[in-house]
């Protein structure tokens, strides 16, 4: 039996997301529960994958099924493609299994040609509407299918409006729009070299190909990488009978949410435009009216719409984002999906759904994207400074948060300025999906047009970027990179501050303060802690970082990098003296100066952690990182050591290495300079003794971590120094103190010989930054130069330094556990690379049985939530 590539809406349901994509599955589900949905069919995600396998062509079998289903659609609707009496017009929309707002392409009014336009103009007695549909179709088809830029058509529209002395598209007459359609076709021919296609089936195949092709466009690829959506999923294509919101004042189109996507507040929230079509609301071409105003215009349709909203939220048990059209006062539902929301809204909605008995605690925890918590923990404006500030303008607060930066006018400039360390605010007439990388780079986004559901608003909310939209008071001059607001001219590089919660726009810079976390955060985190099995620690080198991490729920320090402490104040001078010493005695004298300050640092960390575990990594970087490079500093070091400048320079030159990341660093330093390991051990143990004496109810148990071990004899050598020194200190203090000595697993050989190393180690901690570097053979510092090409060539989908490579590096981790645990059942194992705060990596760590993950302080809540979700998912499976 031939494979099924196409499904009518009546043949699917909500559980078929993988095959029909989110939009197709939900259109089928809405059809099944009896909602007013214009009928159509879905071409599966498998057909998209097949399209790429067949060299970006739709094969005969799939084309044949599409034609068969056009016939079925004609029977259902009673209309025919290209018919002179009753023509069928359709929309063609993408629909991946994960929602990707604005990332892929849509075409409306497909099936039109000049003959059909004349038929529908006469039948409807509304020639203006007919020609409006046709000019829109030509523009969309040219842009999406033939890649003729929208701007050429926008210029023609602007010229037409200027010639006619009008401001809005809706003010153009039927004759104007007919003339515009002919101008558009001429523009198409001048750019493409052939006439605009008249055959509806040819149009349809072109549109379906274009949607499949858009799965691989740059903005979709960036969005997928950022949101962990595999390339292999593909997108479905939905072909749906058109309904028209642009047939007159008794028609309209809108987008609505069942709860406020910015705050989570229950209640209908959205926007509506009369005499408009499809993308008009989202595209921000006209600033729309509030959804509540629809009640006055279309009381019957609005009453029905409210019932539909309640039905859908109860059915999906989540906040819904819906698109709809009203045609001659009749309501039609075009889409529903679980709505994108801010982090604050996500927490409130999850808690409210539990309180409303629509969800249980585990489901509430599983609903929240851990990555979004990042946005909760970032600064807001200082309240006093904000009170004193006078807004220069006000628009819609489309995505909460505070942003301050220098004004830029293009996405490209935003990206380039941010790359050189500038904080920028991107100011645009309106954003489009092409602006995605610039939007990511910006601190905040300000648009002149568009509402709360415009592209800028939806994408900014998803990214957690502050956004203010629809500031119609701005007079924009993009060409000269300036705008005027409230009588003042702003130029590129001027400072601007945005409040994404209130929509206020401020001249200049307003200082920011750390965010305060709402009560729902505590509830969700409490539930997460109840269900997770993984412990969550933090990577912290200072008491301030440790304190912040504890506030955010860290249960210990998984990595304290001791080398960071050497750079503070005048201690770097003593460390440089140690490096440039000729004898062990000279080195020990220099280290003696460092010992008390390092001990003091450790005491403060133990105090901040209140008896929770602290893992201290001994010196790791190569020594050349600590030596001076400035002439003045070299002279100062020479004077301090009583040596000539030439001698110091010779020592510095001798430290140069061709491949320092694999050179004289980590445990190799302790082997060549055992006195460094002795000093660090004394500092760790003396600090622990002092804090234990001061807090007898705490259980201080230092964890000393030896870096870069690849051979068990290295660990034995350094461990012997540590144990001898530690035991001497403990005996001298006359106190009972336990400590552990473990190692980082960051060299592939350590993973391969983990059974030998486990006999000597009390714990393992995966240093996945170096383990990734050495497994791939990629330099962490240089990979950025070629990773972009790897993404484009589909060699890699994600940055392996940000998201754990589970296939290769992950296999080494599993091997380490399987070799180490049988030899040493008490061995505890964690991870302290950057991956410790990445949700998909945390899920993998849970799956392979790690005891803890460790991440930067602000990512602790992300790790806590991701760990809970991993445990809940495992239980459900």
What are these regions (language model features)?
Residues 238, 408, 425-427, 446, ...:
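Structural motif
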Residues 329-332, 429-440, 444, 452-458, ...:
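Glycine-rich phosphate/ribose-binding loops and adjacent secondary-structure elements
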Residues 93, 517, 527-877:
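Conserved alpha/beta-domain cores
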Residues 1-388, 422-425, 432-437, 443, ...:
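Nucleotide/phosphate-binding sheet-loop regions of phosphoryl- and nucleotidyl-transfer enzymes
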Residues 41, 448-450, 469-472, 560, ...:
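Short beta->alpha connector loops at strand-helix junctions that form conserved
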Residues 334-336, 491-539, 545:
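C-terminal domain-closing interface element
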Residues 358-441, 504-510, 521, 525-528, ...:
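Protease-associated
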């Amino acid at each position: 039996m031939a494979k099924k590539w196409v499904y009518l809406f009546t043949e699917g349901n909500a559980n078929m997301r993988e095959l029909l994509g989110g939009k197709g599955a939900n259109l089928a589900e809405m059809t099944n529960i009896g909602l007013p949905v214009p009928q159509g069919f879905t071409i599966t995600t498998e057909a998209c994958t097949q399209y790429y396998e067949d060299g970006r062509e739709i094969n005969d079998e799939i084309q044949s099924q599409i034609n068969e289903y056009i016939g079925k659609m004609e029977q259902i609707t009673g209309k025919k493609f290209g018919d002179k009496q009753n023509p069928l017009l359709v929309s063609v929309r993408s629909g991946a299994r994960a929602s990707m707002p604005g990332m892929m392409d849509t075409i409306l009014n497909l099936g039109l040609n000049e003959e059909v336009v004349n038929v529908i103009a006469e039948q409807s007695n509304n020639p203006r509407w007919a020609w409006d549909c046709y000019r829109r179709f030509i523009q969309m088809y040219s842009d999406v299918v033939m890649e003729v830029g929208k701007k050429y058509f926008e210029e023609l529209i602007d010229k037409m409006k200027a010639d006619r002395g009008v401001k809005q598209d809706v003010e153009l007459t039927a004759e104007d729009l007919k003339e515009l359609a002919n101008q558009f076709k001429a523009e198409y021919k001048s750019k493409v070299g052939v006439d605009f296609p008249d055959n509806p089936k040819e149009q349809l195949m072109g549109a379906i190909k274009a949607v499949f092709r858009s799965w691989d466009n740059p903005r979709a690829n960036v969005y997928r990488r950022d949101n962990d959506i595999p390339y292999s999923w593909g997108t479905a294509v939905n072909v749906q009978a058109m309904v028209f919101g642009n047939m007159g004042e008794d028609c309209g189109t809108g987008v609505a949410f069942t709860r406020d996507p910015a705050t989570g507040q229950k209640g209908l929230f959205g926007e509506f435009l009369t005499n408009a079509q499809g993308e008009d609301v989202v595209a921000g071409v006209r600033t729309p009216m509030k959804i509540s105003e629809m009640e006055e215009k279309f009381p019957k349709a609005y009453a029905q719409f409210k019932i539909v909203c309640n039905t859908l939220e109860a059915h999906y048990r989540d906040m819904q984002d819906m698109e709809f059209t009203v045609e001659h006062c009749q309501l039609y539902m075009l889409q529903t999906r679980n709505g994108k929301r801010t982090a604050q809204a996500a927490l409130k909605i999850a808690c409210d759904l539990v309180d409303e008995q629509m969800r249980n605690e585990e489901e509430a925890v599983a609903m929240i994207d851990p990555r979004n918590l990042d946005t909760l923990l970032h600064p807001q404006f200082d309240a006093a400074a904000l009170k004193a500030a006078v807004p220069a303008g006000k628009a819609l607060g489309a995505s909460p948060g505070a942003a301050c930066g220098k004004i830029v006018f293009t996405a490209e400039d935003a990206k380039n300025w941010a790359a050189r360390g500038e904080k920028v605010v991107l100011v645009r007439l309106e954003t489009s999906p092409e602006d995605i990388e610039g939007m990511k780079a910006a601190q905040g986004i300000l648009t002149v047009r568009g509402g709360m559901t415009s592209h800028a608003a939806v994408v900014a909310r998803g990214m957690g970027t502050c956004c203010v939209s629809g500031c119609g008071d701005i007079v924009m001059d993009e060409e000269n990179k300036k705008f005027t607001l409230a009588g003042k001219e702003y130029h590129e590089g001027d400072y601007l501050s945005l409040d994404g919660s209130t929509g206020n726009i401020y001249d200049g810079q307003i200082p920011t303060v750390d965010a305060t976390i709402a009560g729902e955060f505590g509830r969700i985190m409490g539930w997460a802690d109840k269900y997770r099995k993984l412990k969550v620690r933090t990577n912290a080198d200072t008491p301030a970082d440790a304190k912040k991490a504890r506030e955010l729920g860290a249960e210990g320090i998984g990595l304290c990098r001791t080398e960071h402490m050497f750079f503070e104040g005048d201690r770097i001078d003593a460390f440089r003296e140690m490096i440039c010493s000729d004898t062990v005695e000279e080195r020990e004298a220099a280290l003696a100066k460092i010992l008390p300050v390092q001990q003091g640092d450790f005491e403060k960390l133990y105090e901040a952690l209140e008896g929770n575990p602290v893992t201290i990594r001994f010196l790791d970087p190569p020594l050349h990182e600590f030596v001076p490079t400035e002439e003045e500093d070299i002279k100062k070091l020479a004077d301090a050591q009583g040596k000539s400048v030439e001698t110091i320079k010779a020592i510095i030159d001798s430290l140069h290495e061709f491949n320092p990341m694999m050179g004289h660093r980590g445990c190799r330093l302790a082997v060549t300079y055992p006195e460094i390991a002795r000093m660090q051990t004394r500092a760790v143990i003396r600090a622990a003794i002092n804090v234990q004496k001061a807090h007898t109810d705490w259980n201080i148990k230092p964890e000393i971590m030896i870096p870069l071990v690849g051979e068990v004899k290295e660990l034995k050598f350094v461990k012997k120094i540590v144990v001898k020194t530690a035991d001497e200190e403990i005996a001298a203090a006359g106190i009972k103190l336990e400590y552990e000595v473990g190692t980082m697993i960051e060299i592939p050989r350590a993973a391969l010989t983990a059974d030998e190393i486990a006999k000597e180690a009390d714990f393992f901690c995966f240093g996945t930054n170096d383990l990734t570097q050495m497994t791939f053979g990629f330099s962490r510092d240089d990979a950025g130069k070629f990773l972009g090409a790897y993404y484009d060539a589909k060699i890699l989908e994600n940055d392996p330094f940000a998201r754990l490579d589970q296939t290769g590096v992950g296999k080494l981790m599993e091997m380490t556990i399987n070799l180490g645990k049988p030899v040493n059942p008490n061995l505890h194992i964690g991870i302290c690379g950057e991956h410790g705060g990445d949700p998909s990596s945390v899920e993998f760590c849970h799956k392979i049985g790690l005891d803890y993950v460790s991440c930067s302080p602000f990512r602790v809540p992300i790790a806590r939530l991701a760990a809970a979700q991993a445990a809940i998912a495992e239980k459900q499976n």
